[in-house]
Amino acid sequence: MSSSLGKEKDSKEKDPKVPSAKEREKEAKASGGFGKESKEKEPKTKGKDAKDGKKDSSAAQPGVAFSVDNTIKRPNPAPGTRKKSSNAEVIKELNKCREENSMRLDLSKRSIHILPSSIKELTQLTELYLYSNKLQSLPAEVGCLVNLMTLALSENSLTSLPDSLDNLKKLRMLDLRHNKLREIPSVVYRLDSLTTLYLRFNRITTVEKDIKNLSKLSMLSIRENKIKQLPAEIGELCNLITLDVAHNQLEHLPKEIGNCTQITNLDLQHNELLDLPDTIGNLSSLSRLGLRYNRLSAIPRSLAKCSALEELNLENNNISTLPESLLSSLVKLNSLTLARNCFQLYPVGGPSQFSTIYSLNMEHNRINKIPFGIFSRAKVLSKLNMKDNQLTSLPLDFGTWTSMVELNLATNQLTKIPEDVSGLVSLEVLILSNNLLKKLPHGLGNLRKLRELDLEENKLESLPNEIAYLKDLQKLVLTNNQLTTLPRGIGHLTNLTHLGLGENLLTHLPEEIGTLENLEELYLNDNPNLHSLPFELALCSKLSIMSIENCPLSHLPPQIVAGGPSFIIQFLKMQGPYRAMV
């Protein structure tokens, strides 16, 4: 029950145009980072007849899995399911487009198997959208569309492209995602005006040397294929800003990657990388580097020269240490993910290395101590995830972490929380589940901004009265402790929507629970000594989920208990002083 530590608006413009490289980079950055896997959204096109379509949402933890494919613009059909168009209907659309001299044609989601050859007559087209059909091939006549700048062919069953496409000298954006390509069609290498090329989710095994011909490319996405190596010629793509090769089978990168000095976003997550070339330090514009889920055991010192780096994700590798002073050299770094590695100690480099860090994720390592003063210069550190380490205590300057907003210390071996937790006045999320806590400090009541407090699976026997001061608290998880009672002050937590009290030793609930007017979920399961419920529970008008499994509740008729939460609430209303509410 822990919280994670760590919408684009559709635009409508009169004149449809392909987004510039700078715009795509900006949109890619806004779409998320490298920490979470994301599902690609339905691309959108600009145009006065564009309508809102469905969007897929993703899964981060801090630092978030960056997917550059989210930035394509293409038209959305009216809400509903895939259209089934007859050949006559498609021809009708083509005729209409010709008569109106339209520059943009959307035939997406029509279940088209074969594109009519009369498409060749639409030579005025600059944008053609054929995504989400059933095309296995394109007619050669598409090569007659010499003014085409955008061609969207994703989500079909294409295995090749006609050579006639090399007539498309103005083509800037080509989208071939989610097809059945086993190689990059040779004609693609001849489309030397391309600035954006999407090849995600095919069956491609190699990238040919001819990739060097696409020297104008600013965005190349070949993620989710079966590519084992990149050619040295990748280094000739000097205008490349975003390179997405995630989810392939790369073991090494060519040293020539260092020639792509304009790259700002480099996504290499989910490969088999064993090392990185020293030339990666030449990427002076690099702002986001995704390396999660590889086989790296070391990071080159040269990475320190990437002074523009803002986000670095190294989750799930075999790294036990970083080059000394690496982090302090990365003066713009704000998000660092080192989760699921082999760290036993904090990175060497002193307090200055965290001075710009906003989010630090060290989850699932072997760290047993947070050094005193390590965050003394971390004035903007807001999110710290130390879940699943071997901490037995917290540093003496713990109370000075005043900028902390989300703190996850779950699954450690903490036996107490220092009283000066009261200094963490900005804290909104505090996760302390699965530790060895027997009591809580009174200073906890000073965390007036706290929205979520998770204390599941500890050894708590009571709660301090000061918990009543946490009036912004929305989620309180106390499952699997040794509580016998709750303080009456619990009734002051009027913003509480979720209260987890299962697997304790509660004998009763205080009548003040009836003041929790926003409570929606109440978990009381597995309290073997809980024989009754207060009539005041009937006042919790928003309560929609109540778990009472394995509670004796002997003071209630068995048939009422068997009926579940709604029967119980109704019974409490009928039998208690609040029957007038029925």
UniProtKB/Swiss-Prot annotation:
Changing Y131E: Impairs SMP complex formation. Changing H270Y: Promotes SMP complex formation. Changing K226E: Impairs SMP complex formation. It is found in: Cytoplasm; Nucleus. A motif (RVxF motif) lies at residues 63-66. Changing K180E: Impairs SMP complex formation. Residues 1-29, 36-57 have a biased composition (Basic and acidic residues). LRR repeats lie at residues 101-122, 124-145, 147-169, 170-191, 193-214, 216-237, 239-260, 262-283, 285-307, 308-329, 332-353, 356-377, 380-400, 403-424, 426-448, 449-470, 472-494, 495-516, 518-540, 542-563. Changing K109E: Impairs SMP complex formation. GO terms for molecular function: protein phosphatase 1 binding; protein phosphatase binding; protein phosphatase regulator activity; volume-sensitive anion channel activity. InterPro entries: Leu-rich_rpt, Leu-rich_rpt_typical-subtyp, LRR_dom_sf, LRR_domain-containing, LRR_R13L4/SHOC2-like. GO terms for biological process: cellular response to growth hormone stimulus; cyclic-GMP-AMP transmembrane import across plasma membrane; fibroblast growth factor receptor signaling pathway; intracellular signal transduction; negative regulation of neural precursor cell proliferation; negative regulation of neuron differentiation; nerve growth factor signaling pathway; positive regulation of neuron differentiation. Residues 1-88 are annotated as: Disordered. SMART domains: LRR_BAC, LRR_SD22, LRR_TYP. It is linked to Noonan syndrome-like disorder with loose anagen hair 1: A syndrome characterized by Noonan dysmorphic features such as macrocephaly, high forehead, hypertelorism, palpebral ptosis, low-set and posteriorly rotated ears, short and webbed neck, pectus anomalies, in association with pluckable, sparse, thin and slow-growing hair. Belongs to the SHOC2 family. Component of the SHOC2-MRAS-PP1c (SMP) complex consisting of SHOC2, GTP-bound M-Ras/MRAS and the catalytic subunit of protein phosphatase 1 (either PPP1CA, PPP1CB or PPP1CC). SHOC2 and PP1c preferably bind M-Ras/MRAS, but they also bind K-Ras/KRAS, N-Ras/NRAS and H-Ras/HRAS; these interactions are GTP-dependent and both SHOC2 and PP1c are required to form a stable complex. Interacts with PP1c in the absence of Ras GTPases. Interacts with M-Ras/MRAS and RAF1. Interacts with ERBIN; disrupts the interaction with RAF1 and Ras, preventing the activation of the Ras signaling pathway. Core component of the SHOC2-MRAS-PP1c (SMP) holophosphatase complex that regulates activation of the MAPK pathway. Acts as a scaffolding protein in the SMP complex. The SMP complex specifically dephosphorylates the inhibitory phosphorylation at 'Ser-259' of RAF1 kinase, 'Ser-365' of BRAF kinase and 'Ser-214' of ARAF kinase, stimulating their kinase activities. The SMP complex enhances the dephosphorylation activity and substrate specificity of PP1c. Contains a N-terminal RVxF motif that is important for interaction with PP1c. PP1c (all isoforms) binds to the concave side of SHOC2, via LRR 2-5, 8-11, and 13-18. M-Ras/MRAS binds to the concave side of SHOC2, via LRR 1-10, 12 and 14-16. This is Leucine-rich repeat protein SHOC-2.
